[in-house]
Regions:
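Short alpha-helix boundary/capping segments
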Residues: 6, 23-25, 47-54, 87, ...
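A short core secondary-structure module
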Residues: 1-43
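Conserved hydrophobic/aromatic beta-strand scaffold that supports enzyme active sites
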Residues: 11-15, 30-32, 57-64, 206
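Cytochrome P450 core scaffold surrounding the K-helix E-X-X-R motif
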Residues: 71-76
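Conserved protein kinase catalytic core
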Residues: 3-4, 40, 70, 155, ...
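Alpha-helical interface subdomain recognition
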Residues: 59-64, 78-80, 84-234
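Short, solvent-exposed coil/turn linker segments
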Residues: 23, 34-36, 67-68, 122, ...
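Flexible, small-/acidic-enriched active-site or ligand-binding loops
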Residues: 36-66
Length: 234
């Protein structure tokens, strides 16, 4: 399994099937257990594109792991429901991080465009550069509003699944566009370590995969729409 933050972790959450089958959010149980328990092995640390996670990403092998009942987290057979409850807010915190990454890259590009001259004027006044900065500003504004709306839905008692799924797709893909444009504005400087943008560029690409790839979220959004329509049709 590809597990983020496994290296150095003292505790791990393991979800296992405890019912005859997992359906309607029941049948799986969460366990909070020590990572040094017999049978839990970190096989290797993966060399991933990004470097932004404490503990990195590791491949873990579970081999005949025996966990006592005292390690049960919450109630038996409710693990899947617990996981679903935390997914929406967790995805939204990722969106907030990605918004910060977008802003950092964009601010770097704007500052550069406001001091670098080309063909007799600041490059930010050339449409080829200025339009990219304008597109960045709009993507960032959109991402911020999407995050606010999803957070509002959660604060007002909604499970937020549709809102957070849309936010996850929109923000992760916007981050890729914003950082790519920022690097382009910086030109040759952008691919060096002289600015932070090259590192952000590597960090943002996995965002469209972490916590569910964009394709899975698009599928889930569409499925909810179909379920809503079936209810309307009776």
């Amino acid at each position: 399994w590809l597990i983020t933050g496994a290296r150095g972790a003292g505790l791990g959450i393991i979800m296992a099937r405890t019912g005859d089958k997992v359906e309607h959010g029941r049948g799986a149980t969460m366990f909070l257990t020590d990572m040094d328990r017999a049978g839990i092995e970190i096989v290797r640390d993966l060399d991933t594109l990004d470097r932004g996670f404490t503990g990195g990403h590791s491949e873990i092998l579970l081999n005949d792991v025996r966990i006592p009942a005292s390690d049960i987290l919450g109630e038996i057979d409710e693990g899947y429901r617990y996981a679903q409850v935390r997914l929406g807010p967790a995805r939204l915190t990722h969106c907030m991080r990605w918004l910060g990454a977008m802003n950092r890259a964009h601010d770097t590009a704007v500052a550069y465009a406001a001091r670098r001259e080309g063909f007799g004027r600041l490059i930010g006044h050339h449409e080829g550069v200025g339009f990219q900065l304008a597109d960045n500003e709009m993507d960032i504004h959109m991402a911020r509003l999407v995050i606010w709306q999803a957070a509002w839905a959660l604060d007002n008692g909604s499970d937020g699944r549709q809102e957070t799924a849309m936010a996850k797709v929109l923000c992760s893909e916007a981050a890729g566009r914003v950082v790519d444009r920022s690097l382009q504005v910086l030109g040759g400087l952008g691919i060096t370590s002289d600015t932070v943008v090259s590192r952000i560029y590597r960090d943002v690409r996995p965002f469209r995969i972490y916590d569910g790839p964009s394709e899975v979220h698009r599928w889930s959004i569409a499925e909810r729409l179909m379920r809503q329509q079936r209810k309307k049709n009776g």
